Amino acid sequence: CEFTAKHGDLDLRFTPAPTAQEGMTGHAMAAARRGAGYRSEVALSGQYQNLRVRGRCDGFDPASRRLDEVKTFKGSLERQPAVQRHLHWAQAKVYGWLLCQQEGWNALDVALVYLDIGSQQETVLVEHCSAQQLQEHFEQHCGRFLLWAGQQLAHRMARDTALQALTFPFGDFRAGQRPLAEAVY
């Protein structure tokens, strides 16, 4: 999603950012605050055409049918660029479709849980989504990725074919090149 959902500003920094260790601690803290039936770090996978998509959602509550995508931050959440929030929703909704598919659900709540590392306060943003909406979102992003991947493959094949047709400009080493090449190799 981070690739196919990018738009707008290329500067995705949201500073100051938590360290990796703070992020892991924050995720554990958020999971510990949930109810007894809450499942955390759930592996999900799905297929779109010949593309296999795998990921791990931060957690979900089967009783309330809510998927949580936890994001840790420092400072003011209001300073977070809209572009970054868009990426977070894209990721969470892909996980939402994979979870609906896995559990056989026709809808669920998708939540972005922003945890301020400093204050340990959560800001929770929730969207109710039908499985159909999530599937359309998933297929749109997978389709974009496959289009890009196909273009990359075509470019590489054309490049490699052109490189095979090239001839080196000189038939033999020039004076001093062979000993230099041997010394380097």
Give residue spans per PLM region:
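Metal-dependent nuclease catalytic cores that hydrolyze phosphodiester bonds in DNA/RNA
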Residues: 1-65, 90
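Generic recognition of stable, solvent-exposed alpha-helical segments in well-folded globular domains
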Residues: 25, 87-90, 129, 133-140, ...
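A broad, structural surface signal
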Residues: 28, 93, 97, 143, ...
